Each structure stands twice: as structure tokens, then as C-alpha cells.
Swiss-Prot record:
Organism: Cenarchaeum symbiosum
Residues where ATP binds: 297
Protein name: Lysine--tRNA ligase
Stored InterPro entries: aa-tRNA-synth_I_codon-bd_sub2, aa_tRNA-synth_I_cd-bd_sf, Lys-tRNA-ligase, Rossmann-like_a/b/a_fold
Main subcellular localisation: cytoplasm
Motif ('HIGH' region): 39-47
Domain of life of the organism encoding this protein: Archaea
Keywords on record: Aminoacyl-tRNA synthetase, ATP-binding, Cytoplasm, Ligase, Nucleotide-binding, Protein biosynthesis
GO cellular component: cytoplasm
Family to which the UniProt record says this protein belongs: Belongs to the class-I aminoacyl-tRNA synthetase family.
Length: 524
């Protein structure tokens, strides 16, 4: 089978995108990819992933010889439906108001919406993602969607019927797919848009009670007109994507399964109402918390880029996003160690050559490593040490941690000497050891012989001679008929939750014999 591009799903999508654009007869010199991002709640890894994956497809398009641009569009005209957990209760008075019109409770941005947007932009910057930042407030205020809004609202009756037909939503049969902002009370979801005045391009609305975020919000009773050429309101999501796609010449946008119906309708609006071919898409599954629930911007189960980057490198996040796009995945900060070590394995395989799984697998892993480094050429491997080993050593050495952990890594033969890269890894693993360490480990499968050997070793750890522990461990394994390699692997799994590590005898001495004996007994 022929390898497409660098052998990843990213390359496959990019090739499909370019082939489609060429078949449509559109100019492919510059290809815009878009990520539509919410600004009403705390941005999480799922929000980040939408933009990171779109950027990856853009990189692959660039790899094919085209120019690309990632448009990061933040919907800060969206209304606040509920106050996210952990945010000030003073935000309650702003429910149903556009997040761009709500003061930043922390006073560091021009609005609540920009505060939330800023957190996500901070994450993108940390990863090295380049983007063209656009705000809904400015987009509407500057009239960039004015023509699209006019055509959509002029065809609101047929659109309302189509929405009802496609997804069974009756709402837009009786009201326009446009949320006006009441000029009297400043709320938007309470202001029902009832008529489009095409000649003046204004929307008539009346502000009444509405259900917002699962509760009733009172309207003020005002009736007025909103100018669709400014920021006096916004299109509903059921039609807004299509307006953006045409106005910004968007050729690719991925989407989560939670907005699948909105994308289907927008595709139809784009094709049939705006006479503009909709972008190429791919659907991704959502990140779930460890309880299997969807990660939500308004709930407390949010893994943010900032939290992750306290413990892991940017490459660990990029690996998470680029290794695959299909299938729902449970995600928590406890996944940082495995992704850090997986990146180390990818790097080692990339520079050493070879690898398991045949040529196609090797090509895919090489491509994955390259995308994880944003296609920036790597002259050689970055300094690396097993993350779980670093965490264990960091738990042992809290005073003068960097110096003492580095010394042990040199003694174990893991590194040749100190370096800024290793110091950074020690700092990250130290944060994890201080904040996150849990005695909970993955299940270790042990056969009867290995259990017997481990039980004997736990008893002997207190009496084995100084400096002779490596030979004692080897002898115990042999006496129980357990291959030493397998016995060492079981010990690494118990101590490090990994399949390999430094020379086991000196490592146990460093951790403490009594402590390791307790760890072994806890698994028997």
C-alpha cells in the first residue's frame, strides 16, 4: 500500500482536502482551515484539540506545497448560559448576556469572553501553534458577515422548514435564526427575533421570558430593532458556520460529534442558500473525564492546557492530539506520564531507526514524531529520561532536587551529564510528584512462580549484604525458575509502573529497601 505523505491520518485528510478543492476548481494557492472556539467557559484540552488538529491538517497542506492559514475564531458574542464551577458568583447577574459584554471578573482583559479566549490562546502559543485570531464581536461589528446574514435571513422560512426536516427542531419555523441583543436589558436569548426588515437590514425582536441553561430567565418586555450590520446580535449556530465559511473562504473545519447536527444544516445552508461549497470535514470524538463523562467548559471536570503543561511538555500534548482522531478517550492528568514516555519512545525510534510493526508502521511513527514537532527539523534527540523514573526520584529528593536527581541519572547511565533539557524534565516530573502522586497503580499480572520469588525477595531485602542486592535479586529469580529479565520487569512494574528502568539493585537502594519491600507486599 502506498504511503500518503508522512503516513498519518493528518496526511490522508490533507490529500482528500486538496483533491476536493481541485475537483471544485477552486484556487489552492492559499487554503484556510478554521477552528471555531467557544468563549463562554473555561477552555479545556478538547477546545485546544480542535485548533491543534486543524493546524496539523494545515501543516500537511503546506507540506504538499500550498500555503495555509489557521483561523482561530472565538465566539465571544455567545451568551453566558451558566456560571462555570470555580468562577465568581457575581457572574450570575450576567446570565444571557454576550460574554464580550460581561466585565472580566479578574480585571486583566476587556471582557469575560476575552479572558476565556486568552487562556486558550496562551495554550496555543505554548505549543507553537500559529493562528489568525478573530473575535465574533469584531467580525459582526465590522460587518464582515453582513451579506451572508442578509441572504440567510431573507430565506429564513425555507431554512426553518429545512431545520425541522433535518433534525426535528421546530423553533426556527416561528422565529428567525438570529439572536438579537436587547438594547434595554442587554440580554440576547430572551430577545426573540420575529421579523426581518430586508430593506433596512434590521431584525424586529421582543424581549420576553426564556429558558437559558436549564432555568427560566426573565425578559424585560422591550420591543425593538437590531441592526444586522453591526454587533447588535448574531446568527444562531445552525446557520452561522456557513456564513463564516463563505466570508473567510474556509476550506476545512473538523467538528465534534456534539455539534454534528449543526454542521449538517450549515453544510446545506452553505451549498443551497449561499451557493458556496461547504468545507471539507472530519468528525472527532470527544475527550471524556475518567468517569466517562464529556468534559465541559462549565463543569469542574476540566483538564486545561495550563494544568497539563505544569507536568508535561508541549510535545506530550501534540502527541495526544495527533496520534489519532477517532474514538472517544478518557483523559486526566494521570495520563501525562504515559504520553511523556511514549514521546520518548517515538524519539528514540526516530533517531535509532527500525521499530516494530513493519514499514507502514515505521513510516507512520516517523510521521507522527514529525507532526508532534510541527514539522520542524530536529538535528538530534532532545535529552530524555523515563518520566516515571523522574517522578520516583523526585519523590525521594525534595531538597536540591535537580542536582541530586541528575546525579542519580548519571550513576544509572541514563544520561551523560546535566543539561537544560533534563533540568526542565526534572522540574515537570517534580511538579507531578508534589501535586499528583497517588499510590494507585495499574494492575500487575503475576504468575505463581513470580509471586513466590517476590515474596522471598521482600523478606530478604532487610538482610541482604550492602552492595550485593543485584546478585541477591538475580539469585532469587533463578531459584524460583523465573527468568531474571521477567523478574526485573515485574519489579519495575511494581516500583515505577513501567516495564524497564535503571539497574534494579542500586535503584532499590536509593528508594529504600524497607519501602520497596512494602510496595512488593502490597501487590501480593
Amino acid at each position: 500500500m502506498e504511503t500518503i505523505g508522512r503516513g498519518t491520518w493528518i496526511d490522508k485528510l490533507a490529500h482528500e482536502l486538496v483533491e476536493r478543492e481541485e475537483a471544485l476548481g477552486r484556487d489552492t494557492e492559499m487554503i484556510n482551515v478554521e477552528s471555531g472556539l467557544g468563549a463562554s467557559g473555561i477552555p479545556h484540552m478538547g477546545s485546544l484539540g480542535d485548533a491543534v488538529r486543524a493546524y496539523g491538517v494545515g501543516l500537511a497542506v503546506g507540506d504538499m506545497g500550498h500555503s495555509f492559514r489557521l483561523i482561530a475564531y472565538f465566539d465571544d458574542l455567545d451568551g453566558l448560559r451558566k456560571v462555570p464551577e470555580g468562577m465568581p458568583s457575581s457572574l450570575e447577574e450576567h446570565i444571557a448576556r454576550p460574554v464580550s459584554a460581561i466585565p472580566d471578573p479578574y480585571g486583566c482583559h476587556d471582557s469575560y469572553g476575552m479572558h476565556m479566549s486568552g487562556l486558550l490562546l496562551e495554550g496555543l502559543d505554548a505549543l507553537g501553534i500559529e493562528y489568525d485570531f478573530r473575535r465574533a464581536r469584531d467580525t459582526y461589528r465590522d460587518g464582515l458577515l453582513a451579506e451572508q446574514i442578509h441572504r440567510i435571513l431573507s430565506n429564513s422560512s425555507v431554512i426553518g422548514e429545512k431545520i425541522a426536516e433535518m433534525v426535528g427542531q421546530e423553533k426556527f419555523r416561528s422565529s428567525l435564526p438570529y439572536f438579537a441583543v436587547c438594547e434595554q436589558c442587554g440580554k440576547m436569548y430572551t430577545a426573540e427575533s420575529v421579523e426581518y426588515l430586508a430593506d433596512s437590514r434590521k431584525v424586529r425582536y421582543r424581549c420576553g421570558d426564556a429558558e437559558v441553561g436549564g432555568r427560566k430567565i426573565a425578559g424585560c418586555g422591550h420591543e425593538g430593532e437590531a441592526d444586522t450590520g453591526g454587533a447588535g446580535g448574531k446568527l444562531a449556530w445552525k446557520v452561522e458556520f456557513a456564513a463564516r465559511w463563505q466570508a473567510f473562504d474556509v476550506r476545512f473545519e473538523a467538528y465534534g460529534k456534539d455539534i454534528m447536527d449543526s454542521v449538517r444544516i450549515n453544510d446545506w445552508v452553505s451549498d443551497e442558500i449561499l451557493s458556496s461549497p461547504h468545507p471539507h470535514h472530519t468528525r472527532y470524538e470527544m475527550f471524556l473525564d475518567k468517569g466517562g463523562k464529556k468534559i465541559s467548559k462549565s463543569s469542574g471536570n476540566v483538564v486545561t492546557p495550563q494544568k497539563w503543561l505544569r507536568y508535561g511538555t508541549p510535545q506530550s500534548i501534540l502527541l495526544l492530539m495527533y496520534k489519532r482522531i477517532t474514538g472517544a478517550r478518557e483523559l486526566g492528568l494521570e495520563d501525562v506520564p504515559s504520553l511523556m514516555d511514549e514521546y520518548g519512545d517515538l524519539q528514540r525510534e526516530y533517531f535509532a531507526g527500525g521499530g516494530r510493526g513493519g514499514k507502514a508502521r515505521e513510516a507512520k511513527n516517523r510521521g507522527l514524531f514529525e507532526y508532534t514537532n510541527l514539522l520542524e527539523a530536529q538535528e538530534g534527540p532532545r535529552p530524555h529520561a523515563g518520566y516515571r523514573l523522574l517522578v520516583e526520584l523526585s519523590r525521594l529528593f525534595r531538597e536540591n532536587r535537580t542536582e541530586r536527581v541528575t546525579k542519580k541519572l548519571v550513576e544509572y547511565g541514563v544520561i551523560d551529564g546535566p543539561s537544560p533539557g533534563i533540568e526542565r524534565l526534572i522540574a515537570l516530573a517534580g511538579n507531578y510528584a508534589d501535586d499528583m502522586y497517588s499510590a494507585e497503580r495499574t494492575e500487575v499480572e503475576l504468575d505463581g512462580a513470580t509471586r513466590g520469588a517476590l515474596s522471598e525477595l521482600a523478606e530478604m531485602l532487610g538482610s541482604a549484604p550492602e552492595g550485593g542486592l543485584q546478585d541477591v535479586i538475580y539469585g532469587v529469580a533463578k531459584s524460583h525458575g523465573v527468568p531474571p529479565r521477567d523478574f526485573f520487569k515485574a519489579l519495575y512494574r511494581i516500583i515505577l509502573d513501567a516495564s524497564s528502568g535503571p539497574r534494579i539493585g542500586p535503584f532499590i537502594e536509593d528508594i529504600g529497601r524497607e519501602k520497596v519491600a512494602g510496595m512488593i507486599r502490597g501487590r501480593l
